[in-house]
Amino acid sequence: MSLFDLTALELGAKIQAGEVGAVEATRACLARIEAKEPTVHAFVTVTPEAAVARAEDVQKRIQSGELTHPLAGVPMAIKDLISTKGVRTTCSSKMLENYVPVFDATVVQKLDAIGAVCLGKTNMDEFAMGSSTESSYFGVTRNPWDLMRVPGGSSGGSAAAVAAREVFYALGSDTGGSIRQPASFCGVTGIKPTYGAVSRYGLLAYASSLDQIGPLTIDARDAAAVTAALMGKDEMDATSVAAPVPVLPEKARLDGLRVGIPQAYFGEGLDADVRERVMDAAHELERLGATLVEVDMPILKYSIPAYYILACA
C-alpha cells in the first residue's frame, strides 16, 4: 500500500507506531507537491525547509512520548487567509502579496500544539470572494481529477491539495459554501463547523457573522478528528463557544433521523450523474436507519440575494 492510499488518521497511527516517520511523510508530500503543482497549482506558498525542520522536531517529540495526538506528524496545509506567523498570508491578492503576519491564528496554535506539520498556504479566490479559485492573483487552481475543470472555491486550493494527495488534510474557511462546495467538486470531505465552535481569531474576515474555519479531508473520520482539534472557546474571539466535540461511533446508526430531500435542488439542468450520486448518499443514510422526506423549500429562491446582502453588509 502506498503512503498516499492512507487517510490522515491511518498515517498518524503508523507514525505513532514508528512504521512511518514524520520526516519521511513530509518529504514524500513535498516531492508530490513538486510533481503536481505545475498542473494543479493548489499552493500560493510552499515552505519545504520549515516543514522538514518541523517534522524533525515533531518526530523526536513523538519518539519521546511527548506528542501522542493521532494527527501528530501528519502533513497538512492552510488556506491563505489564515494568519501564520512568519509565513506570508496573501488572501490570493496583489494587495497582500508581501504581508507576513506577526502572529498565528488560534487554529494554527491548536494544530501546532498537537504536532501538525504544515507544508504551506493554499490558493483561493481573491479575498474569498468567489466559487471557482479562478480569481487568485497568483493564478488558477485546477481540479486534480480533470485539469479542464475548476476545483470550486473559495477554498479550492485546499480541496485540490487534498484531492491530489499533496497533503493529508487542509484548513479552509466557509462563509456561504467555500468549504462544502469545493469538497464536493474535488471528491473530498469538508465541514463548515457550527458558528462559534471554532475560533475566527487570525482569519482575515469576509463576513464575520457567517465565516467559519473548517477542515477538508480524505474521509469523515479525518474530518471529525481535525474539527475536534480546532474546536474550543477562545478569549480572542467573543463569538466562540464551548461546543460539544464530535465523536464518531464505530458503527453508525441514524435511527430516528429525518433527512430532507429539497425538490428545488433536483430541477431542470441538474446533471443526471450528480443526481444519482446524491441519491446514492441519501439511500446510504436510509440504510443506516434514517428516514428520507421530500420537502418543499420555496424560501430557497431568496437565499442567494440574502447571502449577498448579509455578506457585504
Can you describe what each PLM-predicted range is?
Residues 1-52, 63, 287-288:
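An N-terminal boundary/leader segment
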Residues 19-27, 56, 248, 270-296:
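Acyltransferase
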Residues 29, 51, 73, 79, ...:
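Conserved hydrophobic/aromatic pocket- or pore-lining residues that grip, position, or stack substrates
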Residues 49-56, 115-116, 125:
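Long amphipathic alpha-helix in the N-terminal Rossmann-like dinucleotide-binding domain
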Residues 58-74, 222, 251-260:
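Immediate post-signal peptide segment of exported/extracytoplasmic ligand-binding proteins
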Residues 70-107, 131:
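Enzymes and membrane/adaptor proteins characterized by extended Gly/Ser/Thr/Asp/Glu-rich
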Residues 101-230:
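Short glycine/serine-rich loop segments
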Residues 192-281, 299:
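A short helix-breaking turn/cap at a secondary-structure junction
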